[in-house]
Amino acid sequence: MANFTAADVKRLRELTGAGMLACKNALAETDGDFDKAVEALRIKGAKDVGKRAERATAEGLVAAKDGALIELNCETDFVAKNAEFQTLADQVVAAAAAAKPADVDALKGASIGDKTVEQAIAELSAKIGEKLELRRVAIFDGTVEAYLHRRSADLPPAVGVLVEYRGDDAAAAHAVALQIAALRARYLSRDDVPEDIVASERRIAEETARAEGKPEQALPKIVEGRLNGFFKDAVLLEQASVSDNKKTVKALLDVAGVTVTRFVRFEVGQA
C-alpha cells in the first residue's frame, strides 16, 4: 500500500514543478519521503526541481536596521503595499535592532511603544483582515552591510541581505551584498557546506551521469567536475564575481582587504 496520498502528489508537484506522473512515481520509489522524492526527480532531470522546491507561498517584505533583518509576511501583495503594514515592519525591525532577540519568539515579546511586537502584529491583522506572520529575524554585530532589493518599483523590498565583515572597504562589502542578493549564495566557504548536502550532490551527480550513459571509468572525474560546479554556484567565495566574472568573489575581497565573516539572505516566498 502506498504511503502517500493524492494530496501529497499535488504538494510535490507544486514544490518542484515536475509532472503529476513523475511526482507520483518519485513518491512511490521513495516510500512517500518528500526529500528523497525531490532528489529522485533531480536525478531524472526534472526541470528546476532544486530551485522550485525551496520556494514557499507568501507575500510581504523584508526590512533592515542597524544589523537586524526581518521578514514579515502577509497573504496578498495588496497588503504588502499597504502603508500601515510597511510602518509596522519598520517598527518591528527597530525593535529587533534594539532588543537583539535570539529568535522570532523572543522578538515577539519585544516592545513597540506600550505593546509587544506580537500584539502590534495581531492588532493590524485584525484591522486589515489578513493573516500576518513574523517569519524570521537575523541579528549581526560588528561591522555590517545591509542591502534591500525590490522586485518592482510598486512593491516593498522582497530580498534582504546582511553581510558581517572585517576591513575598511565599505564599497567592497556592498558589492558582496549585491552579489548575494543576485546569485543566492547559500554558504560562505566550502567548509560550511554540510556533509549530508555534499553527499547528496555527489550521489545525484553520479546517478545522473550513469543515466546519461557515461562510461563507468569516467564517472569519478565527471562527478568531481559537477560537484565543483555545485560549489561554484552555492558557495559565495567560489562564485564568479558579478562585477568581473573572470575573478572569484574571494579574489576580489583579497585585493580589497575585506574578510566576510558571515552573511544571511532573506527572500519573501523562499524557504
Swiss-Prot record:
- The residue ranges crossing the membrane are none
**CC annotations in GO:** cytosol; peptidoglycan-based cell wall; plasma membrane
A GO biological process of this protein is: translational elongation
Q: Where is this region: Involved in Mg(2+) ion dislocation from EF-Tu?
A: 76-79
- Which molecular function terms from Gene Ontology are attached? translation elongation factor activity
Compartment list: Cytoplasm
Q: Which CDD domains match?
A: UBA_EF-Ts (cd14275)
Where the protein is mainly located, per its record?
A: cytoplasm
Q: Keywords for this entry?
A: Cytoplasm, Elongation factor, Protein biosynthesis
The source's domain of life comes to: Bacteria
Gene3D superfamilies per the record? 1.10.286.20, DNA helicase RuvA subunit, C-terminal domain, Elongation factor Ts, dimerisation domain
Instruction: Tell me any Pfam family this protein matches.
Output: EF_TS
Q: Which SUPFAM superfamilies match?
A: Elongation factor Ts (EF-Ts), dimerisation domain (SSF54713), UBA-like (SSF46934)
- Fill in the misc note: Was identified as a high-confidence drug target.
Q: What's its job?
A: Associates with the EF-Tu.GDP complex and induces the exchange of GDP to GTP. It remains bound to the aminoacyl-tRNA.EF-Tu.GTP complex up to the GTP hydrolysis stage on the ribosome.
Report the family membership. Belongs to the EF-Ts family.
- Protein name in UniProt: Elongation factor Ts
Q: Which organism is it from?
A: Mycobacterium tuberculosis (strain ATCC 25618 / H37Rv)
